[in-house]
């Protein structure tokens, strides 16, 4: 599942609207919509705010690519 789908699904399960999530995170409605539709490139700070409100844990995985 992609991150936008996961965020939308969790928001829906919690009975929150996009506007609710916008209010709780203090992010604009436009940002919430763009994150859920995976348009643009949200910052780590933005994803942390959303994850915090939705009760999700944000895990970052770093892979080393041989050059």
Which residues does each PLM region occupy?
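Short, conserved catalytic or interaction motifs in soluble domains
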Residues: 37, 62-64
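DNA major-groove recognition helix of helix-turn-helix/homeodomain DNA-binding modules
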Residues: 45-61
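Recognition helix of helix-turn-helix/homeodomain-like DNA-binding domains
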Residues: 26-41
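Short basic helix-loop element that most often maps to the first helix and adjoining turn
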Residues: 5-23
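Conserved beta-strand edge residues that scaffold enzyme active sites
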Residues: 25, 64-65
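Absolute protein N-terminus
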Residues: 1-3
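Small-residue (primarily alanine) positions within well-ordered alpha-helices
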Residues: 22-25, 51
